[in-house]
């Protein structure tokens, strides 16, 4: 919803923005930060395949759609990694596969969906068209028709230096000197990125792993974050907001009376 909120004037007269995201790999009472990109660019890919179906005893009379689908699923990620700089971290992974209703019938339609993620925003912009081309090229030898829905998602969240420093200082004041941990750039996507295309800001990882708890992944069904993290997140966000307001007040006072400020 970030794009729609920005279009409706959310960031009008807003000098900076802050956000948090739960992280089950960071301990309760700590936050994860980094200057620069903290998330990745992310797109959604939907592929609708069609071809002549038929009996599994005579695949040569069909386009053998499921075999074609399997080749697209395997070859598209592999080809993209060869056509982009490996350091850009292009990743295509599939989350949905659907085709067929019977074990002895080759279907005439199939569906494949997933995401493309990229650490580097410039490569992300280039890889979009490249992805569509590769899908078409892989599908052609099998005779299937591939209709691609490539939904451009979000760029990386890029934390600015000043705002990240504000946030870290607020967290240290609230939680202690050892409360800050450096986190790696995540392959996840976050639409807060669009806000930081408009104003400077920073997003941090809120630790939710209680002492003795196993490490979960965000989308695991049994992930149960510690509820104590809620209060910690509120404290850090409130303290950060107050620091940001004081910074703006000090800047305004300096601008209003530069001579007096220089005399000090």
Which stretches of residues belong to each language-model region?
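Metal-dependent amide/peptide-bond hydrolase catalytic core
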Residues: 67-264
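Histidine/acidic-residue-rich, glycine-tolerant segments that coordinate divalent metal ions
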Residues: 1-107, 189-190
